């Protein structure tokens, strides 16, 4: 039994990008017709993996290298629908945003700046709540405040909510 899953296709795209990124060629061709029909949206997942692998945090590099790689998809099967292309784009933008936050040095992305950046996500439809030290004291969040006492910067807790899922979907929460 074939147990090929969407994440396998994403990983395949990432592996492909890793191999071609340092090659001499800058143009590649991929046939969607060679992918067996049971792997719906194969090309979408494959290109998504390539895009995720292409991420680089080079915000502070003085010499930024730019390399254009052209991927030409031809054929009529397994192409991503416009709706799926939007889904992949949103996933990529969210992933890159998180990677940017994680990669920022602590002297740049301090608690104040972190809260400010996450507050800007309200424009994307997220409900963002920012709890400063005064609110945290009121909530009895003494352990969090205790950790923050070692810093000259204030402590913050930020919660974000996305209510765009179907009504019957189970809630999903991340804590970190």
Where are these predicted regions, by residue range?
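Short amphipathic alpha-helical segment within the helicase RecA-like ATPase core
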Residues: 1-175
